[in-house]
Amino acid sequence: MSSQKKKISLFAFFLLTVITITLKTYFSYYVDFSLGVKGLVQNLILLMNPYSLVALVLSVFLFFKGKKAFWFMFIGGFLLTFLLYANVVYFRFFSDFLTFSTLNQVGNVESMGGAVSASFKWYDFVYFIDTLVYLFILIFKTKWLDTKAFSKKFVPVVMAASVALFFLNLAFAETDRPELLTRTFDHKYLVKYLGPYNFTVYDGVKTIENNQQKALASEDDLTKVLNYTKQRQTEPNPEYYGVAKKKNIIKIHLESFQTFLINKKVNGKEVTPFLNKLSSGKQQFTYFPNFFHQTGQGKTSDSEFTMDNSLYGLPQGSAFSLKGDNTYQSLPAILDQKQGYKSDVMHGDYKTFWNRDQVYKHFGIDKFYDATYYDMSDKNVVNLGLKDKIFFKDSANYQAKMKSPFYSHLITLTNHYPFTLDEKDATIEKSNTGDATVDGYIQTARYLDEALEEYINDLKKKGLYDNSVIMIYGDHYGISENHNNAMEKLLGEKITPAKFTDLNRTGFWIKIPGKSGGINNEYAGQVDVMPTILHLAGIDTKNYLMFGTDLFSKGHNQVVPFRNGDFITKDYKYVNGKIYSNKNNELITTQPADFEKNKKQVEKDLEMSDNVLNGDLFRFYKNPDFKKVNPSKYKYETGPKANSKK
């Protein structure tokens, strides 16, 4: 390019950077993010929302002059690109967007190795083509750049136009989704209407507000929550109340398990033959087919948190990571104080993952059997941790030495994304959808099913089965919306938003000594487990703050809230702002009579639970039935096999 030819001005470089970042954002909307965009208004909003913040941020560098102005513009553009791409990779794995809260979980990434790498796609270079071109120009073709300063008097005009565009965007968004910023729990809504960059700013503001909430919280805030939850309490079913008093309680966590696998055949073979038997109602287990996970960004940790506290996880981040130092009145601590239970958690991963080694102390959990208690040599490990069959076998040996009554929680790992399994461990062929995630899920789910059967048989041999309450549950979905096309091939039906909600059934099975099994079709969620167990143990719950209700109570609440503000009842589901019938998943145009009441209850539940966590409200509670847990009395020793990894 000769000196007579027109050079690239700083303003032209600014426009190029804004346009290319916006184009990449559009690309992510339609290729990587599942935002459920419908109609002219939503598509118009999608075209509009990336510009405002990108232009506002980059316009700051128009105040600079010389080559450094171009470099600052380049760095700013690269950081915005990196934010976009980080959200893309995160969304592929979690079907959610990055928040400031999730940055506290960055330590988990190293442990998740292969699962994260599986989230990279061949076409990801698209996100960085412009970055490489700009870098080439800045390093090798500086003569193409017009280093004259941009007229500073026009910079405020550019900034004002960016701000005006944001408010226009917000006006359109409020028209299509009223009270977007005040009553929306779903991050997908926020990104759809605001874009990923404005969402990051919004999340930063909410994070600051939540951090301030603890300092401003008072006993009055606790009283409001107690008054609300006490109105919701239900009477225990006299047929079940106290039937499991001082019985061992074993809780088995099935990683990433979804109940569409129950009675599902692939290539003529049952995927989960053992769980199929437990689900028949003919065994000693009662099966709840309409049991849903209620997790948020914390996924596995959220399921643990919700089931042991009858609280919901946070709208952003993991309660384990962000609120691990709070005061709690958890199920294991109550069982200890009321009936002398000793509690433990068993998991074939290391204790720092999800901040477990700290938060368990605040739950009053006595012992943590982490990876250092198991042989973690290469032959015993797959994907994220210890193979389930080895984990269950060793865990049963530990349990055989425990004094009754104990409360024991076993967390499996093999059926975890990206669902890889050693060939020697596979006993069923993969499905043939062409999607490695979905096809691998079939094999790892079968392996989990076999491991569970071996464990149950082991409990019988060791004399632990008959005297124990045994709970089994799926912690969260395994197959995200990103794999809907493959799921349609596997299930032979269209995966609509309503159908995807149905697929969030993760199942709950419970064996109660002295009770026969069956099938219970009540709609329920993980928040309902704690009050159920307390009533089975014969513990009066009137002074405990819980958002769930007893599964066996005749007054059990069948409105199941999800962390994003959607919900399902026994008759209909509310998904992405629309109501669908449970019978056929068809859209309901006439609003059900109890819809507004249920919607307000869900919003209130989530709001009140968030207040408990953000305000650390249990620190104010003088519960006559509970002595506050002293976390300093708990110490989790390193196990005898700490050096087994090779």
From Swiss-Prot:
InterPro entries found in the cross-reference section: Alkaline_phosphatase_core_sf (IPR017850), LtaS-like (IPR012160), OpgB/LTA_synthase_biosynth (IPR050448), Sulfatase_N (IPR000917)
Extracellular side: 29-43, 90-119, 175-646
Site (Cleavage): A217, S218
Active-site annotation: T300
GO cellular component terms, A-Z: extracellular region; plasma membrane
Top-rank taxon: Bacteria
Keyword DNA-binding among UniProt keywords: no
Gene3D superfamilies: 3.30.1120.170, Alkaline Phosphatase, subunit A
Segments crossing the lipid bilayer: 8-28, 44-64, 69-89, 120-140, 154-174
Its membrane topology: Multi-pass membrane protein
Ranges per topology, Cytoplasmic: 1-7, 65-68, 141-153
Pathway: Cell wall biogenesis; lipoteichoic acid biosynthesis
Localisation: Cell membrane
Keyword Transmembrane: yes
Binding site for Mn(2+): E255, T300, D475, H476
E.C. number(s) listed in UniProt: 2.7.8.-
Region described as Disordered: 623-646
Binding site for substrate: H416
GO molecular function annotation: metal ion binding; transferase activity
Keyword terms, alphabetized: Cell membrane, Cell wall biogenesis/degradation, Manganese, Membrane, Metal-binding, Secreted, Transferase, Transmembrane, Transmembrane helix
Family in the record: Belongs to the LTA synthase family.
Functional note: Catalyzes the polymerization of lipoteichoic acid (LTA) polyglycerol phosphate, a reaction that presumably uses phosphatidylglycerol (PG) as substrate. Is required for staphylococcal growth and cell division process.
Protein name according to UniProt: Lipoteichoic acid synthase
Organism classification: Bacteria, Bacillati, Bacillota, Bacilli, Bacillales
